[in-house]
Amino acid sequence: MNEVKESLRSIEQKYKLFQQQQFTFIAALEHCRENAHDKIRPISSIEQVQSYMEHYCNNSTDRRILLMFMDICSELNKLCQHFEALHSGTPVTNSLLEKCKTLVSQSNDLSILRAKYPHDVVNHLSCDEARNHYGGVVSLIPIVLDLMKEWIAHSEKLPRKVLQHGTT
């Protein structure tokens, strides 16, 4: 369990760095959307961000911030697998884990996702951006981090036997 907590802390630190550069991230997505002639559709999946990065990203600053987003998503995905291996779960932890796995899936539609208070990532966007283009993609990481913290909190309340059973 300590290893999982440490992994989550590490991801949170990377996210804090990423969050400080949200305007750079939005600008990078905007540049890629322009290059792709795709200004109408919202950013709706991790897969779409990856495609933009691979095919429509023209400068190192944009590539770096998009890669940072992709790396955090990849680490969240790996942590989901680590959670799964830790114990067989309860209905509550299994539900939280399924939500996490769905959210970090490459093709999951993020367009309607919106982080709520205390997260202010959506508030930093203009109304048009928040409503139409980037609200989902900037909400993904804080929502998944919250679900993972909740999973850990519920898992720590389980009897030791349940936790040990999952590792044998």
Swiss-Prot record:
One Pfam entry name: SPACA9
GO cellular component terms attached to this protein's record: acrosomal vesicle; axonemal microtubule; axonemal microtubule doublet inner sheath; ciliary basal body; ciliary base; cytoplasm; cytoplasmic microtubule; nucleus
GO MF term set: calcium-dependent protein binding; microtubule binding
Keywords: Cell projection, Cilium, Cytoplasm, Cytoplasmic vesicle, Cytoskeleton, Flagellum, Nucleus
Alphabetical list of InterPro entries matching this protein: SPACA9
Location of the protein in the cell: Cytoplasm; Cytoplasmic vesicle, Secretory vesicle, Acrosome; Cytoplasm, Cytoskeleton, Cilium basal body; Cytoplasm, Cytoskeleton, Flagellum axoneme
Superkingdom of the source species: Eukaryota
Residues under site feature: Essential for interaction with INCA1: 117, 119
Tissue distribution: Testis-specific. Expressed in round spermatids.
Quaternary state and interactors: Microtubule inner protein component of sperm flagellar doublet microtubules. Interacts with CABP1 and CALR. Interacts with INCA1. Interacts with microtubules.
Role, per record: Microtubule inner protein (MIP) part of the dynein-decorated doublet microtubules (DMTs) of multiciliated respiratory cells and the distal singlet microtubules of monoflagellated spermatozoa. Forms an extensive interaction network cross-linking the lumen of axonemal doublet microtubules.
Name recorded for this polypeptide: Sperm acrosome-associated protein 9
Organism: Rattus norvegicus
Organism placement in taxonomy: Eukaryota, Metazoa, Chordata, Craniata, Vertebrata
Chain's gene name: Spaca9
